[in-house]
C-alpha cells in the first residue's frame, strides 16, 4: 500500500534539499496541518536540524542563567512577575555581588554547562552608569575564573556605549526578545516602551559583532498566523540563537488565567521555526518542564537543538543532571554527543 505525504510537506522538503528558508506561503499551509500529518512535519524539521544545525562536535546547546537583579521593574510586560504594574509575589533584590554570581556560575560549570547568562530586571542601560560598570567587572571576573565559559548577558535595552563595552569584554551572546509578531507587541506584551527600542538594541549589537539571542513567548493571546509573522521577523533581524518559551501563567499578572496553546500548535510552531531558520540554534526555554511535561522531548525532535537548564528568572526548572540524561536519551535520534 502506498501512503502519500501531505502536498505542503512535500513542498517543504525543499528546505532539506537546499538549506534555504521555507517560503512564507508554504508556512501558512503547514500551519493548518492536523492529525497524522503533524508527525511528518516534525520528522522533516528534525532532519533539517540534523543536516544544517549541527553544533560543535554534534552537541546540543545548553545554557543556564542567574537572575542577578530581581523585581522592581517599571515596564508593564503582561506575562512578567517582576513588573511593578503586576501583583505577583516575587523576590526583590538589587544587583547581586560578584561572589554570589561567580559561585552560581561555578555550580553550573561543574555540571558541564559552558554558557552562562547574567540577567537583570528593568528597562536597561541607555548609558554607562555605576551599576553597569559593576556588571562588566563581574563579566570579567567570570571569564578569569572560568576561561572556557561563554559568558552571556540579558540586561534590557541598551545604548551604543554599553553595547561597545560588552563587545570589548567579549560577551558571547546577548539576549533581548521581541516576544511576538511586531504589530502585536504593544497590546500583547507591553506599551511602556516601543518594540523599536529592542530592535534598535539588536542592530547595535550586530554592529559591534555581538551575536544576538532573540526569541519570544507562545500562549499570550497570539494566533498561529501571528506566530509565523514573529518567526519571519526574526529572519529579518538575522538572529543567532532563538529561545522559544511557552507561557507559564503566574498569579498576579494579567495573563494568570491564560489558556495554554494546544500541544499540536506548539510543536508545529517549533517545527516551522526550524524550517524558516535551518542553521540557527533554536532552544526551548520556559514551559519545557511544566507546560510540555512528558512531551518536552517531542520538541527536541521537532527542530530544537538547545535548551535552558537549571531554572528560569522566577520559576524553577529541572536539575542539570536530569537534563544531561535527557540529552543522552535524545542522542538516539541523531548523531549528537552529550558534551
Swiss-Prot record:
Q: Which cofactor does it need?
A: [4Fe-4S] cluster; [2Fe-2S] cluster
Q: Which CDD domains match?
A: Radical_SAM (cd01335)
Instruction: From the UniProt record, give one GO term of the biological process aspect.
Output: biotin biosynthetic process
Reaction catalysed by this chain?
Answer: (4R,5S)-dethiobiotin + (sulfur carrier)-SH + 2 reduced [2Fe-2S]-[ferredoxin] + 2 S-adenosyl-L-methionine = (sulfur carrier)-H + biotin + 2 5'-deoxyadenosine + 2 L-methionine + 2 oxidized [2Fe-2S]-[ferredoxin]
Question: Could you tell me which InterPro entries the record lists for this protein?
Answer: Aldolase_TIM, BATS_dom, Biotin_synth/BioAB, Biotin_synthase, Elp3/MiaA/NifB-like_rSAM, rSAM
Q: Where does [4Fe-4S] cluster bind?
A: 73, 77, 80
Q: What does the UniProt keyword field contain? A: 2Fe-2S, 4Fe-4S, Biotin biosynthesis, Iron, Iron-sulfur, Metal-binding, S-adenosyl-L-methionine, Transferase
What does the cofactor section's free text say about binding? Binds 1 [4Fe-4S] cluster. The cluster is coordinated with 3 cysteines and an exchangeable S-adenosyl-L-methionine.
EC number of the protein: 2.8.1.6
Cited PANTHER family: BIOTIN SYNTHASE, BIOTIN SYNTHASE, MITOCHONDRIAL
Protein's recorded name: Biotin synthase
Species this protein is from: Chlorobium phaeobacteroides (strain BS1)
Q: Which gene encodes it?
A: bioB
